[in-house]
């Protein structure tokens, strides 16, 4: 900005200061141009001595990172983990990660044994396992998914615990999760058949939800025996 104020071309001013910032100094033609615009010698000498300057944009980015990762992680931990899992976690798996720390540790050790041969999806799961382990280590826990309260793709803080999003159920994609959340707004599901018809969820996903205890005592069909 100073060089622009002194009358140098804006593009040339940027090029000069990028060179100075990286410790590459000044070309002779730049020095001549600066002197032609009455840039003082002390300024030119300073540009020749600078080895590195931290850009403002980088400084701002580090401050924002410190706010998110340091301050929020320490003082608003559940909000931090809810945001992280909702936005950053691409391999979060409800069955593996939300059934207690012991179960997670079992799967994590298995992944570690196969670390060099993990698929891309498994690598994402393994990365998210570490964050979940950190959360458990800090004394926080998950609450089971409530199909009437859970969001399609957002974790929630419920009674001091995290409720995972519907799309963390293995096999339930984003569209299916949205369909479940929308169908739940229309009232209680009378049976698994009713759930299947209203949400279009696959039998595999419904069976998994049943095994995980997410469907409660929901009967198989509406028919009375």
Regions found by a protein language model. Name each.
Residues 1-225:
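Noncatalytic, beta-rich nucleic-acid-contacting surfaces in large DNA/RNA-processing enzymes
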């Amino acid at each position: 900005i100073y060089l622009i104020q002194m009358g140098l071309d804006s593009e040339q001013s940027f090029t000069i200061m990028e060179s100075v910032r990286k410790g590459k100094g000044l070309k002779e033609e730049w020095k001549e141009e600066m002197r032609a615009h009455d840039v003082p010698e002390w300024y030119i000498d300073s540009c020749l001595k600078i080895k590195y300057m931290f850009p403002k944009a980088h400084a701002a980015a580090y401050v924002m990172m410190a706010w998110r990762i340091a301050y929020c992680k320490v003082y608003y931990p559940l909000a931090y983990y809810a945001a992280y899992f909702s936005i950053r976690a691409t391999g979060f798996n409800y069955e593996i990660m939300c059934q207690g720390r012991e179960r997670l540790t079992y799967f994590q050790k298995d992944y570690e044994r196969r670390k060099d041969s993990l698929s891309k999806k498994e690598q994402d799961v393994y990365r998210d396992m570490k964050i979940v382990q950190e959360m458990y280590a800090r004394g926080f826990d998950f609450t089971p998914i409530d199909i009437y309260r859970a969001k399609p793709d957002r974790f929630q803080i419920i009674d001091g615990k995290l409720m995972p999003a519907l799309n963390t159920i293995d096999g339930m994609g984003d569209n299916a999760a949205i369909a479940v959340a929308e169908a739940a707004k229309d009232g209680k599901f009378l049976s698994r058949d009713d759930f299947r018809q209203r949400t279009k969820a696959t039998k595999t996903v419904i069976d998994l939800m049943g095994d995980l205890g997410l469907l409660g005592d929901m009967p198989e069909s509406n028919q009375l025996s």
